[in-house]
């Protein structure tokens, strides 16, 4: 059987573009889970363009409570900055069910290639 994990980055991107807390990533992620998906996926980036470290930790608690998979994708070499603890630190704190390594850079709009 194929499992579906929904990436909620664009929900966070829209929230950040608007400022404030709307749309609410936690509420919409819970709705997505209640529709029957097998997991939630996020891709936190050092520039905080969508998912923030706080979102990661909040969504981790939700996925534990709802008993669905939590997948964090990102560049394992992404270092910390003033507002971002670094990808490896996020993974160590959140302890996702799955971690997908993505070779993207800060200059990329979106991930578009694999590892060489």
Language-model segments: which ranges?
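Conserved N-terminal beta1-alpha1 strand-loop-helix module at the mouth
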Residues: 1-70, 78, 93
